[in-house]
UniProtKB/Swiss-Prot annotation:
Belongs to the QueA family. Transfers and isomerizes the ribose moiety from AdoMet to the 7-aminomethyl group of 7-deazaguanine (preQ1-tRNA) to give epoxyqueuosine (oQ-tRNA). One of its GO terms (cellular component) is cytoplasm. The gene is queA. Pfam families: Queuosine_synth. It catalyses: 7-aminomethyl-7-carbaguanosine(34) in tRNA + S-adenosyl-L-methionine = epoxyqueuosine(34) in tRNA + adenine + L-methionine + 2 H(+). Pathway: tRNA modification; tRNA-queuosine biosynthesis. This is S-adenosylmethionine:tRNA ribosyltransferase-isomerase. Monomer. One of its GO terms (molecular function) is S-adenosylmethionine:tRNA ribosyltransferase-isomerase activity.
Length: 356
């Protein structure tokens, strides 16, 4: 399978640089997986698409202000993007600099260069950085960090992004990118869903900066997926098994929820799904056998990205590419701050040949 099979033309003007004034007022393109039929509407139509007893699975990770600016004590500007917090004093990070710092190099971070840190080790493309400060890493980031807006949002971060680029139910700090499908849910919509009898459960997957890395190989099977930490606790497992037992659907909110649930299913020894607390490198592309997820709420993804591959594996390649073509024609807003899709599973997707 070639990466170029997942290319589509996207006019620059369709990339959303700001969210809608109201979270749930975005547009919703619904794709019926088995038939490929498309329906255009608004996000609140979700209320009519979900049944009492269906289970919505959200990712409750919280985005940290993971981008830091500063300089090496020896001179030379640097930009630090946290990949993950290792403990209260250390981070693993990407560092952009004209010359990469060496172990032992002192860093002065923050717009006023008031925070002292040391680059202690290098792990491939990532740098281990230790803060020489009494405060915890999270406190330091909250004080001097910038929100890590995706590279295709071509503007500096603003104070408003600290809330807008965050789901209303975010709880566990650790992500450097928002699980963006969740951005469309506001409290009134969540209340209406609960009132209808829709069940809710929360996994945690701390989205890493690797989510924005382009696929740099020609053949999909050669791609090595970045690693992210995920948690699928017992209560989620119980809720999934109960929904399946009563004939209801498990609906993942976002590709990160999909990857968490399907990672837990892959690792399960005795049941459909079991608790999972580990790093995952799951790479979902056409031919993948879904075990847990029956429907998916997701945003529109980048051409040739691992996420459009995940959607193609779920709805079928042809149905997915047709939906994206229609979305471009209908001028849907794309990517993190853009519009959403509601997709039901296509059991025939696994048999589809791509690029032949």
């Amino acid at each position: 399978m070639r990466v170029t099979d997942f290319f589509f033309e996207l006019p620059e003007s369709l990339i959303a640089h700001y969210p809608m004034p109201e979270r749930s007022s975005c547009r919703l393109l619904s794709l019926d997986g088995p038939t490929g039929a498309l329906t255009h509407g608004t996000f609140t139509d979700l209320l009519d698409k979900l049944n009492p007893g269906d289970l919505l699975v959200f990712n409750n990770t919280r985005v940290i202000p993971a981008r830091l600016f500063g300089r090496k004590a020896s001179g030379g500007k640097i930009e630090v993007l946290v990949e993950r917090m290792l403990d209260d004093k250390r981070i693993l990070a990407h560092i952009r600099a004209s010359k990469a710092p060496k172990p032992g190099a002192e860093l002065l971070l923050g717009d006023d260069e008031s925070i002292n840190a040391t680059m202690t080790a290098r792990h491939g493309a990532l740098f281990e950085v230790e803060f020489n400060d009494d405060r915890s890493v999270l406190d330091i980031l909250n004080s001097i960090g910038h929100m890590p807006l995706p590279p295709y949002i071509d503007r500096p971060d603003e104070d408003a992004d600290r809330e807008l680029y965050q789901t209303v139910y975010s709880e566990k700090p650790g992500a450097v990118a928002a699980p963006t499908a969740g951005l469309h849910f506001d409290e009134p919509l969540l209340e209406k869903l609960r009132a209808k009898g829709v069940e809710m459960a929360f996994v945690t997957l701390h989205v890493g900066a690797g989510t924005f890395q382009p696929v740099r190989v020609d053949t999909i099977e050669d791609h090595i997926m970045h690693s992210e930490y995920a948690e699928v606790p017992q209560d989620v497992v119980d809720a999934v098994l109960a929904a399946k037992a009563r004939g209801n659907r498990v609906i993942a909110v976002g590709t990160t929820s999909v990857r968490s649930l399907e990672s837990a299913a892959q690792a399960a020894k005795n049941d459909l799904i079991e608790p999972f607390f580990d790093d995952t490198q799951i790479f979902i592309y056409p031919g993948f056998q879904y075990k847990v997820v029956d429907a998916l709420v997701t945003n529109f993804h980048l051409p040739e990205s691992t996420l459009i591959m995940l959607v193609s594996a779920f709805a079928g390649y042809q149905h997915t590419m047709n939906a994206y073509k229609a979305a471009v024609e209908e001028k849907y807003r794309f990517f993190s701050y853009g519009d959403a899709m509601f997709i039901t599973y296509n059991p025939q997707a696994i048999n589809e040949r791509v690029g032949e």
